[in-house]
């Protein structure tokens, strides 16, 4: 079952990205390095509700 998730920057708190994930294969929260437009660099983004 795929669900929509929001990825928020850990440094600014901005919610920059929306993605989907499979809850059966990835039950834990996702952490990805993505580009933050406000900081103009790549930062860690975590899954939020």
Swiss-Prot record:
Gene Ontology cellular-component annotations: cytoplasm; ribonucleoprotein complex; ribosome
Domain of life from the UniProt record: Bacteria
Tagged with keyword Ribonucleoprotein: yes
Keyword Ribosomal protein part of the UniProt annotation: yes
Gene Ontology terms: biological process: translation
One Pfam family named in its UniProt record: Ribosomal_L33
Family matches, as SUPFAM superfamilies: Zn-binding ribosomal proteins (SSF57829)
Keywords: Ribonucleoprotein, Ribosomal protein
GO MF, any single term: structural constituent of ribosome
Family listed: Belongs to the bacterial ribosomal protein bL33 family.
Entry protein name: Large ribosomal subunit protein bL33B
Name of encoding gene: rpmG2
């Amino acid at each position: 079952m795929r669900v929509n998730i929001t990825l928020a920057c850990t440094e600014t708190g901005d919610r920059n990205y929306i993605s989907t994930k499979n809850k059966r294969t990835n039950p834990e929260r996702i952490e990805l390095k993505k580009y933050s437009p406000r900081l103009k660099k790549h930062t860690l983004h975590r899954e939020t509700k």
